[in-house]
Each structure stands twice: as C-alpha cells, then as structure tokens.
Amino acid sequence: FFNSLDVYFYGSFSLMALMPRLDGVVMKRFGDAILAVNNNRRRHHEYVNLPYADLPDPKLEGPRAVRGAVIHDLGSPFDAEPDAYDWHNVKEWKDLAPKYVLMVLRHYVKTQDKQNLQDCKEAVYAAMQYLEKMVNEGENFPLTHGTDDTFDNLSSHGISVYCGSLWIAGLRAAAKIAELLG
C-alpha cells in the first residue's frame, strides 16, 4: 500500500527530518481523502466467506469513502484510489483519526508551516467529529468492538488503553491546532 497511515505514523520520523515538504504533501493528500465521498460499495474480504450474510452491514460491506472517515492508505499498485485496503472496514477503526491529527500537529511543530496546518484543518476537524460519533452516549471514549483498530487481527472489546490514549492525545492536538489557527 502507498503510505499506509498506521505504519506511516510510526515510520515517518525520518521523512519528516530529511524531507519535511514531502511529509506535508502526504498530510494534505490524506486530508483530501478524509474529506472525499465515494459511494461505490465494496465487500470487505474479512467476510468474503459469508456470501449469504444480510446486507447492508457495515462490517460486511460499505461505501469506499465517507467524509470524515480516516482511510488506511493512499492506494496500492493494484488500486490507485485512496483506501485500497479492503480486508476490514477501516471507517470503524478508532486509532486512525487521532494518528492523523497528531501527525498534522507534529508537522507544524517541526516546520512551523502554518499554511500546511491551514490546508489540513478541515480534515482534522472532520476526522475527529467522525470519530466522536462513535462515542456512545454516557461514555467518554470510543469503545472497541472487535477488530476495529490498526491491530486488525487482534480483537478487543470495550475501552482500549491504546485507542483511548490516542483519543485523548488527538483531542488535545485538535484543540492545539484550533488555538494556533485562531
């Protein structure tokens, strides 16, 4: 996959240090994809062995792009469109939105490129609002319900320390971005 966001989150420090403008472009491309809408439906391969499952079920199939949902990647050699990963429905993943927000803020802290921050602002807010919709009434964290984070082969249920800590960090980073942009 091209620029798998979850792997990029951990591996992009060297790119940031050596080619910060390229890192900024990657943040903008993810921002464009986060704001995109593509209603083409696709079945997620994790569930391909359930050909008779009732549809539509967001675990089984769904639209390619939903505004605010942070995608997995910017395409692949076999599928040039963003979010080529189709094993799981990544629109349910709880860790991608805060990772994106943290990377946008990190880029600004390193480069002081306020224009890049401005260019990504709408995607930052849309991503956090999308994830906030997954917080159940009376709860403070988006709960996990199986394989809905980037540890996609490990199932967890309820409050995840991993996703919860990213949620808090993402909220703080989004607030800092709002403060920086006035």
Would you name each region that the model predicts?
Residues 2-138, 159-178:
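Aromatic-rich carbohydrate-recognition surfaces in CAZymes
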Residues 139-143:
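Acidic, glycine-anchored loop motifs typical of Ca2+
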Residues 144-151:
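Short, conserved phosphate-binding/catalytic loop or strand-edge motifs used
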Residues 154-157:
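Structural transition elements
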